[in-house]
Amino acid sequence: MTTNVRTPAELEAAERAVAIGTFDGVHRGHRAAIEAVKATGLRSTVVTFDPHPRRVLGYEVELVTTLGRRIELIDEIGPDELLVLEFTPELSRLEPEEFVRAVLEPLGTRVVVAAESFRFGQGRRGDLDLLRRLGLDVQVVPQVEGVSSSRVRELLRAGDVLGAADILGRPHEVEGLVVAGDQRGGTLGFPTANIAVEPGLLVPAHGIYAGSALEHRAAASIGVNPHYGGSERRIEAFLLDYEGDLYGQNLRLELWQRLRDERAFASEDELVRQIAADVEAAQQAVRPS
């Protein structure tokens, strides 16, 4: 099992191969880098940052995964160690050479695995050539066009969860605490779990989705519920063949396929018929992999 730590001082002395980056979403490119450090024969170490560096620099960034889920996904790949470094304004101002001395040298880094586009240090002035000049062995992971966290965000904002899953190597997930809602779903025969996600997490485009949660297929709604004149975004999921109280629990909802736009209906009967059709579509949906 991966050893998760917060400071380099918690790691025992060793020669290390390091994959370094934010790893938001832990997509197929990230996985390739982590597998490459595992293959070096050295202590395989992943260094990631929290909060996201661009947030520290004053930019708004919606994250694909929570830090906790990021750690879980990296752990599933199986490096020896995962170091979560706090990204601070002071760290962002380090010159590239200072960054290497402050972050990589204390780890006993011998090999750095990264994509050719990897940049670090103040103004992103550090690159792989600088790492080589500083005496580090650099292994370049081939970068596949379109495989990036930024592209995942673009696809999710467009509601293309299938395209996002192709880059991630798994379905995108929406995760959060189940909180009380309006109880309308129950009165219509389709009780839903109302999921409150962490602030700053990216939520896909409004619409109706097929997916799963707790190993049950699910029909999910993301949006403002226009049939009832809503204005606040909500994430609600009806779990097929599930009985039980989910309030107060953390629920992880996989999104497999976007079924349709959200809309208002001429009557409640028409709404119920459409929900039934959505549930049937969710029953037939195929999980992307």
Q: Where do the protein language model's features map onto the residues?
A:
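Glycine-rich, Lys/Arg-enriched anion-binding loops that position phosphate/diphosphate groups
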Residues: 127, 132-224
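Short acidic-hydrophobic, aromatic-tinged amphipathic segments that line or gate anion-handling sites
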Residues: 1-10
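N-terminal Rossmann-like or analogous alpha/beta NTP/dinucleotide-binding catalytic cores
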Residues: 53-134
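N-terminal catalytic cores of NTP/NDP-binding nucleotidyl/phosphoryl-transfer enzymes
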Residues: 10-72
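Phosphate/ribose-recognition catalytic cores of enzymes acting on nucleotide-derived substrates
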Residues: 182-289
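Residue-level signal for inorganic ion chemistry
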Residues: 27, 74, 112, 164, ...
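Generic structural signal for residues in well-ordered beta-strands
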Residues: 4-5, 82, 138
